[in-house]
């Protein structure tokens, strides 16, 4: 890479670190190209991205971001997985790490909070932002549904009473 390319790459990576909801750093030594391509496609499908960067350039890109505390993680062959949703990147990385022991999660960051490997693992167990929104909407809609049922119940009961009187009159 030429100097200008490196500057552009660092700037791009810096913007990624600033905009991402979460960042995960992992060792990937021993992961085959096919496995890495599979991992990248899974991450892309979930809405995240996987990048491999020189450690020195990644450390420079971290300067001036909230995630600056994770510079110590960049040793050896490291990859960076990130996503806008704070749960997506950790979830996909941990799922892939379960099936591939060559991928070792080192840690990561969520905003200004630096996470160790256990922190990333626990973050991966949380529901995604969309799932939380769906649960919240369900909780909000549940009382409205109950109110509608209660309001509609007397009308249906009244209709049954009228129907019973009509049948009684017909029988007599």
Swiss-Prot record:
One of its GO terms (biological process) is translation. GO terms for molecular function: large ribosomal subunit rRNA binding; structural constituent of ribosome. It comes from the Bacteria. Coiled coil: none annotated. InterPro entries: Ribosomal_uL10, Ribosomal_uL10-like_sf, Ribosomal_uL10_bac, Ribosomal_uL10_bac_type, Ribosomal_uL10_CS_bac. Keywords: Ribonucleoprotein, Ribosomal protein, RNA-binding, rRNA-binding. PROSITE patterns: RIBOSOMAL_L10. One of its GO terms (cellular component) is large ribosomal subunit. This is Large ribosomal subunit protein uL10. It comes from Rhizobium meliloti (strain 1021) (Ensifer meliloti).
């Amino acid at each position: 890479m030429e100097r200008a390319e490196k500057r552009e790459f660092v700037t791009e990576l810096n913007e990624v670190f600033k905009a991402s909801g979460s960042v995960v750093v992992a060792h990937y030594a021993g992961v085959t190209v096919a496995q890495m391509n599979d991992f990248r496609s899974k991450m892309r499908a979930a809405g995240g991205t996987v990048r491999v960067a020189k450690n020195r350039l990644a450390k420079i890109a971290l300067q001036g971001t909230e995630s600056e505390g994770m510079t110590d993680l960049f040793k050896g062959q490291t990859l960076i997985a990130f996503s806008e949703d704070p749960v997506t990147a950790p979830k996909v990385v941990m799922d892939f790490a379960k099936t591939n022991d060559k991928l070792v999660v080192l840690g990561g960051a969520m905003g200004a909070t630096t996470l160790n490997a256990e922190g990333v693992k626990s973050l991966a167990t949380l529901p995604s932002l969309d799932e939380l929104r769906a649960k919240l909407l369900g909780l909000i809609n549940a009382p409205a549904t109950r109110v509608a049922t209660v309001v509609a119940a007397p009308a249906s009961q009244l209709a049954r009473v009228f129907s019973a009187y009509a049948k009684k009159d017909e029988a007599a």
